[in-house]
Amino acid sequence: MKLTINGETRDVSAATLAALLKELDYVGNWLATAHNGEVVPAKERSSCRLSEGDRIEILSPMKGG
């Protein structure tokens, strides 16, 4: 299915947000995720079902200076 991930359209096979993170090789509970503009806590990612056209944001912490 086609999803918009961090502003880029991608074709993926994952059915849940947790599966998507695994498919895209994101690991760790330190990630921040949003599904169609709503924050999804780490504990809810496995129950967050994805649908064609959904918008996903995946953010990871960066060192600043």
Per-range role (PLM):
Residues M1-G64:
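Ubiquitin-like/PB1-type beta-grasp interaction modules and other compact soluble beta-rich domains
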